[in-house]
């Protein structure tokens, strides 16, 4: 494992963007969400650039970014999202994944977006090994690195390893 770092892609007001606009009219909510997305994209871009420079200083080059997508419905209207607490949570996650996608493209990186439910099959195909062996290796990657090393970090490592094989 070369670098493990969170991307700081929000300011305090926009940490949960759809929650922040939950009780606004659709027009005002749309405007605020656009602003929050611009902030998240700029912050993600700055973080990607900083991490890329850090790795460049160690003789490595960043070529791609992997994004694990949720299984949530993508084509839901804003009024429907704001009327459902579950959809608000899904939209919050999609908001930051979309910001990361745009930021990575702005940095001229290849972007691989894959639904979480297809990640293991994708990894098995890319790495040409039994998935049990792959998952065993991923589980060991975080040993001695300190917390967190939970399911999200393991999935991110699995996608990163898969991208290295391409």
Identify the function of each model-found stretch.
Residues 1-166:
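Phosphate- and other anionic-substrate recognition elements at nucleic-acid/protein interfaces
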């Amino acid at each position: 494992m070369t670098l493990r770092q969170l991307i700081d892609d929000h300011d305090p007001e926009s940490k949960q963007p759809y929650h922040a606009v939950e009780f606004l009219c659709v027009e005002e909510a749309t405007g605020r969400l656009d602003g929050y997305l611009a902030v998240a994209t700029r912050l993600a871009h700055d973080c990607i650039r900083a991490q890329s420079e850090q790795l460049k200083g160690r003789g490595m080059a960043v070529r791609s970014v992997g994004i694990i997508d949720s299984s949530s419905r993508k084509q839901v209207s804003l009024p429907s999202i704001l009327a459902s607490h579950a959809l608000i949570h899904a939209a919050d996650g999609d908001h930051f994944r979309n910001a990361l996608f745009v930021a990575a493209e702005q940095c001229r990186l290849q972007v691989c977006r894959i639904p979480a439910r297809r990640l293991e099959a994708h990894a098995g195909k890319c790495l040409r090994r039994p998935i049990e062996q792959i998952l065993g290796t991923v589980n060991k990657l975080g040993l001695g690195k300190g917390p967190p090393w939970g399911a999200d970090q393991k999935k991110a490592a699995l996608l990163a390893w898969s991208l290295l094989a391409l």
